[in-house]
């Protein structure tokens, strides 16, 4: 039986910008996407640590090395520039193949502080 499990997470990223009039999505620095094993147009759950809001959206790539985290569309009304967010991607796994999520921990400058492979 397959189960939906946490695949990867970018923990405590800082929102650098938001655009209500853009068609939707979360823009993420391509370097972070590569390190986290996330892909453009992948479905993600985003949790705002500052206000508790959660929303589902999809990823669009931002320039590699830009350190940008940009919330677009209607979800931009749920966050403020400078808020810290947790970005979570999920996958479907057989219980015997799941090894745990990859976790990217960020600092306040959107620099990677630690990369962990959590075990189950």
UniProtKB/Swiss-Prot annotation:
Name of the molecule in the record: Aspartate 1-decarboxylase
GO biological process: alanine biosynthetic process; pantothenate biosynthetic process
Top-rank EC class of the record's enzyme: lyase
GO MF term list: aspartate 1-decarboxylase activity
Organism this protein belongs to: Thermosipho africanus (strain TCF52B)
Entry superkingdom: Bacteria
Catalytic-site annotation from UniProt: 25 (schiff-base intermediate with substrate), 58 (proton donor)
Main location class: cytoplasm
């Amino acid at each position: 039986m397959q189960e939906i499990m946490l695949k990867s997470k970018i923990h405590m990223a800082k929102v650098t910008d938001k655009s209500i009039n853009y068609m939707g999505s979360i823009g993420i620095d391509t370097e972070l996407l590569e390190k986290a094993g996330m892909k453009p147009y992948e479905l993600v759950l985003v949790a705002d640590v500052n206000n508790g809001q959660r929303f589902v959206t999809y990823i669009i790539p931002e320039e590699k090395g830009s350190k940008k985290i940009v919330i677009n569309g209607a979800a931009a009304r749920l966050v403020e520039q400078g808020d810290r967010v947790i970005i979570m991607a999920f996958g479907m796994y057989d219980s015997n193949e799941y090894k745990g999520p990859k976790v990217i921990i960020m600092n306040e400058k959107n620099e990677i502080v630690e990369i962990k492979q959590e075990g189950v």
